[in-house]
Amino acid sequence: MKSLCLLAIVAVVSAEVYFKEEFNDASWEKRWVQSKHKDDFGAFKLSAGKFFDVESRDQGIQTSQDAKFYSRAAKFDKEFSNKGKTLVIQYTVKHEQGIDCGGGYVKVMRGDADLADFHGETPYNVMFGPDICGPTRRVHVILNYKGENKLIKKEITCKSDELTHLYTLILNADNTYEVKIDGESAQTGSLEEDWDLLPAKKIKDPDAKKPEDWDEREYIDDAEDVKPEDWEKPEHIPDPDAKKPEDWDDEMDGEWEPPMIDNPEYKGEWKPKQIKNPAYKGKWIHPEIENPEYTPDDELYLYENWGAIGFDLWQVKSGTIFDNVLITDSVEEAEAHAAETFDKLKTVEKEKKEKADEEARKVEEEARKKAEEEKEAKKDDDEEEEKEEEEGHDEL
């Protein structure tokens, strides 16, 4: 046990943190550049939200204007390559407003990105994080490969409540990845298999064709099955119980015809029974060959230059809080940082919100009861007033 603890300590000590932002004070505005690409971007403000433990520790930057684009980014202290290393992107998101449509993701870019002109078309290495609009609740993991942005093929569902959640992306040097939400694994896999980064290893043989005599019909009509002679019956017949109305005038109304009814003897279209096809060979499978366009890439994970991170978002309803942004080469460092930030907040935040929700529910219930009592009292007053009016009328 002692050796394991020592290994963990060594791993954290040797870890390199390329970027860390906790938004503990107003100095964040000096580090995060407001894009000037357009003049009506929404404004971020410093806030811990409604429910927190330690305000200075738990505060982050919050979107503050509805129906706005947001664009703000920061440079790392130094640019780096993740060659031969693990890369971890981690941060927290709280959709305190009960978001209906809006992004909560980050874009991690090269160091030469022009942050003053940061916008939706600015190239990036990785885009990661939650995106919600209507029923769609997805964690984006988009990798830029040879100038093209490639979406992950797997569905990862994000959190959509009003609490803080921790999102972690781990890119490994063996071309594998892991997405964690609140410290729990949400998806793992291979970069090659879960993104369309490379051409397919195999393709259908263009020279292969299904033989003309290949029979894929598992069942066929029984040639010996014969339609019964009494099968053909009309679908509808005249109603035998119908009688011409006594006042029916053939000259005025035309020749009377009884209404039609469903024929109880109608059997529908006759079809011969099905039997096993003796010539059935199964479904023909197109043979595959090695794809001459495929070339393996052992460095799908690799980006030679990392140097900036930014929020480029659209939100219909503002109120999302971002905090505890971390870029490191160590999973252990990311876990340690989460333990000092997210883990200390989540329990207290949940308890305070549940208490506030319960108090709000009680207030709402009391208001409902009061409204019902007032409605009932008014009904009694109206009935009493009506009764008095009737008694006065009787006396007259």
UniProtKB/Swiss-Prot annotation:
Motif Prevents secretion from ER location, chain numbering: 393-396
- Where in or outside the cell is it found? Endoplasmic reticulum lumen
The sequence repeats are found at 186-197, 205-216, 222-233, 239-250, 254-264, 268-278, 282-292
Source domain of life is Eukaryota
Assigned keywords, A-Z: Calcium, Chaperone, Disulfide bond, Endoplasmic reticulum, Lectin, Metal-binding, Repeat, Signal, Zinc
Q: Where is this region: P-domain?
A: 193-301
Q: Per its UniProt record, what InterPro entries does this chain match?
A: Calret/calnex, Calret/calnex_CS, Calreticulin, Calreticulin/calnexin_P_dom_sf, ConA-like_dom_sf
* Family of this protein: Belongs to the calreticulin family.
**Know the name of this protein?**
Calreticulin
Provenance organism: Caenorhabditis briggsae
